[in-house]
Amino acid sequence: MKTLTILRHAKSGWDVQVERDFDRPINKRGARGAELIGQWLKRQKLPVDRIIASPAVRVTETLDIFQPAADLGTLEPHWDRRIYLASSATLIDVIRDTGKNAEHLLISGHNPGLEDLILMLVPESADD
């Protein structure tokens, strides 16, 4: 069975002056959160074999902390600019395009696209 893990970037700081939103970094709270989530994934014993991610600074910084904590070794993310500010439909396209050969695909990006993707993939109730 194929597995999809959806990881939003860690908490970012609005107090840092950057010219573009794309360049906004994570903050200290975000760094702690990225490490904790990585440790959680490691405990689940679900080996990730493919990562696709937005190349935005806050995503790259999140993965720099998350990956060692999750013990993902030298797995290199596939950076896909389409993920930045993507709709759920675009995210589905990215997953189809780059996740075909993965058994456990991790996608890392941004809201509202990731949240909309989850709402599209998960039924409203267990009865559905």
Task: Locate predicted features.
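Active-site-proximal alpha-helix that buttresses catalytic centers in soluble enzyme cores
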Residues: 2-3, 7-82, 125-127
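Hydrophobic packing residues within well-ordered alpha-helices of enzyme cores
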Residues: 62-66, 91, 117-118
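Surface-exposed beta-strand edges and their flanking turn/coil or helix-capping segments
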Residues: 19, 92-94, 108
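Short phosphate-binding loop-to-helix
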Residues: 83-100
